[in-house]
Amino acid sequence: MTVTPSFIEYVLVDLFAGDPAITARPMFGAVGLYFEGKIFGIISADQVYFKADKSNIRSFVSRGSEQFSYMKNGIEHRLPYWLLPAEILENPHLLMKWAKKSSMIELNSN
């Protein structure tokens, strides 16, 4: 799950144009992405994942996205984060729109 510093810089500077509303912080071997202090995504293994729920999951699934998962003690754990499609990464307007939408999602801690 390593994340290279150059990839974090690419995400923050190149993809989000250095927008000060977008920040990144290390978390559990990955990096959390925040919009105005609210987590909306993660970077893991130099891949970008955005938070999803019933309000936006179809946008990810219809584009062939995969859900973030990791193995712990031989058990696969899935988190409500989905791989960001390349077409969204390459479109600054859509990227910010998706980031804002994902930042509004409140996850239940069951």
Where are these regions (language model features)?
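Charge-dense, helix-prone N-terminal extensions
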Residues: 1-110
